[in-house]
Amino acid sequence: MDINEQIFYKAELLTKGMRASDVAKSLLFSEFPDFFTKGIMHSLNVRFSETNCNVSIADDFAHESPYLLDVKDGQFFITDGQKSFPVSFFGALPHTGTVVDDFARLHSTGCVTIWPSSNCCYDKPNEKCKFCSIVKESETPLDADVLSEAIKKLFELSKDNMLNFSGGTYKNPDAMADYWIDLVKKIRAFSPAKIAIEFAPPSDLQKIVKMKEAGVDVAIMNLEVANDDLRKKICPGKSKISYDHYYNAFNKAVEVFGWGQVSSVLIAGIQPKEDIMSECEKMAKIGVFPTVMPIRPLDNAPVDLNTRCDPDDLIEIATHLAKLLVKYNLDFKKQEGCTKCGGCSIENDCYRKELQNA
């Protein structure tokens, strides 16, 4: 598969999801039972050609997908009825007997993602982000002492991993920043592993400095929607954090973490592509790595099921973004976490193509 096909099929899978045959489901259950016990069958992290891809498989919108995960002679493959290509899985983390068995998962080789908080202060009537599918399972985040001890056990059994933390914003952005600072300090007592954290910009920007001092390596603050008026409609609660404050936080984070060690997600399919491309350059020129993820109408998200991202638009945006990444010296391989994984977007693949064509 050449790079153009890789980009095409990844854009298709990200925007349309895929179905799974009964045979494939059965074999997945026997080979990767953790996919089911952790609810990972809602999406699968797969690798094909030279890319990672997080594919929706159980959400309602994926039931109409032209793509099917199947298996033959023990080999998993994806087909649209005309072309087929093999895929592999990243497998499961070792069993620790701790809370990470329920919360941690491999998103790509060596990238462990953990959501300590399922409680978001914006998950309220008339405040929840329209694209968000978070479901509150606990009133508070996992206790930092309990989680850090669990991660220590995991690292004793599985070395050379980095950590990517995400999840709901508990109480408010400042309180959540304090939680991350406390947790990372505890992890740093036993591990030098790279740590990336997704968080909403705190009102006190000194907390970003304290996160770096605690041992965080990468800061991820997702703006999601470029146009401020549209952002207020799509993110009615989170948009109380002003657009200007996001950029104040971006500038502070780049100052503290360094060029290319800060990133932000923009969501394609819910806003004009021209707005996204313009915002990408505004971010890139100050050292923030833009990531463009397509909207996926996930179950439990308020977004209408018919809200989709055109895969051709996603490719156009990512091709433009790849040129910006080269122009502003932003290399995904130098930023740990979501950016390096690249499973939910295609700009890394387009960046590789841009370098090949240079």
What are these regions (language model features)?
Residues S88-F90, D123-E127, A175-A177:
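Short, conserved acidic/polar surface loops in the N-terminal third of protein domains
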Residues N161-L163, G260-S263, Q335-E336:
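Residue-level recognition of the N-termini of beta-strands and the immediately preceding loop/turn
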Residues A20-S21, K25-N52, P94-K136, K152-M162:
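N-terminal pre-triad scaffold of radical SAM enzymes
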Residues C120-C121, E139, T169-P173:
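Short acidic, S/G/P-rich loop/turn micro-motifs used as interaction or catalytic elements
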Residues Y67, F76-G110:
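Non-catalytic propeptide/linker segments at domain boundaries
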